[in-house]
């Protein structure tokens, strides 16, 4: 959006139709059909104290991978709750969450824990959206439905230097007696970053989005349902002049082209009204337009997910025509058939930590 005024600085499963679970078990729609009998049994994978005591947590040593859940299907994860006690700064960036479906060795979810819940700069703040929320105090919640037919395995790895003193978790899932519908798609979440983005000093035109910041790339059939993103400004000025661009099924030019970063995240005019957090969109952290300032934003396409039958490349410009070199951190969320394309390698832990990169200093 061009400013007109100065503003402050899932593999499709082939179960027989006669043995399918209802759509309601997959939907997760609150208060929908509460008067009707359910066709699932609610189960929970949890850190509770098996001795009957009150030590309802796990510790995680440096380098250790803790299995949070390893359950047979069919089922649907309906809610994930986590809270963490750790002495280490930026532990939200140093703990890595992974989720695997159907015995795959390549994770369908791979992201630092904080980033998965929209805390992309490694610090806690409170907000409430429909699929994700952070409650008081430091309570991380996900309500994304995550179906699995044969197996669901979730892990967390401590890539920090300090022992996690307490990692509490509850993973609620619906154990099903019948197969999932044949067109069921699997949940995916992918972390990306650019620290910094590479500024392009060209003619101010960007038609094909070659140098855009990429949220995700996928092959197969599925639909994109949203993104959380955090920005650290490396120079004064407005970071969000860049347009969102979605390339569906190999299109060379954007299938969907936006008008500005704050417009995509459903704000306007540089988010000048201040921070906000709504059910499907928000900017819960809004800085000034100055070097070193931090921003966090999110958008969920729950009304009309962006569909693809072969491939999708979801991206956004970093500044107008990619003319800025700020630091971007993001997690994209989507559903698709399995197998999925292997994700890019997760950056080393030290590279994931927010730090200022002034122009000319890198």
Go through each PLM region and give its residues.
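Sec/Tat signal peptide C-region and signal peptidase I cleavage site
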Residues: 15-19
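Bacterial N-terminal signal peptides
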Residues: 5-14
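Beta-strand-centric surfaces of beta-sandwich/beta-rich domains
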Residues: 20-362
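N-terminal secretory signal peptides that target proteins for export/translocation
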Residues: 1-2
């Amino acid at each position: 959006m061009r400013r007109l005024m100065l503003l402050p600085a899932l593999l499709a499963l082939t179960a027989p139709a006669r043995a399918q679970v209802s759509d309601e078990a997959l939907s997760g729609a609150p208060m929908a059909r509460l008067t009707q009998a359910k066709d699932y049994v609610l189960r929970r994978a949890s850190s509770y104290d098996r001795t009957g005591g009150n030590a309802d947590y796990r510790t995680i040593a440096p380098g250790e991978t803790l299995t949070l859940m390893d359950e047979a299907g069919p089922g649907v994860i309906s809610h994930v709750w986590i809270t963490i006690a750790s002495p280490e700064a930026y532990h939200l960036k140093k703990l890595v969450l992974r989720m695997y479906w159907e015995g795959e060795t390549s994770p369908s979810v791979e992201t630092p824990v904080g980033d998965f819940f929209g805390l992309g700069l490694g610090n806690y703040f409170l907000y409430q959206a429909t699929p994700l929320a952070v409650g008081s105090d430091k309570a991380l919640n996900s309500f994304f439905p995550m179906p699995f037919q044969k197996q669901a395995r979730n892990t967390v790895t401590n890539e920090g230097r300090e022992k996690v003193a307490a990692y509490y978790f509850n993973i609620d899932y619906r154990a099903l007696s019948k197969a999932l519908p044949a067109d069921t798609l699997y949940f995916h979440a992918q972390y990306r970053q650019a620290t910094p983005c590479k500024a392009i000093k060209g003619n101010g035109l960007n038609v094909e989005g070659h140098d855009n910041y990429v949220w995700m790339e996928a092959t197969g059939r599925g639909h994109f349902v949203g993104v959380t993103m955090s920005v650290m400004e490396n120079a004064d000025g407005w970071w969000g002049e860049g347009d969102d661009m979605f390339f569906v099924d190999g299109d060379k030019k954007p299938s969907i082209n936006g008008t500005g970063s704050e417009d995509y995240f459903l704000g306007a005019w540089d988010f000048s009204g201040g921070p906000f957090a709504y059910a499907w969109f928000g900017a819960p952290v809004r800085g000034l337009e100055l070097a070193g300032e931090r921003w966090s934003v999110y958008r969920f396409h729950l009304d009309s997910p962006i569909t693809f039958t072969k491939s999708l490349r979801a991206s956004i410009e970093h500044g107008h025509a990619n003319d800025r070199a700020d630091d971007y951190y993001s997690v994209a969320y989507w559903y698709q058939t399995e197998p999925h394309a292997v994700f890019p390698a997760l950056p080393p832990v030290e590279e994931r930590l927010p730090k200022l990169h002034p122009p000319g200093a890198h």
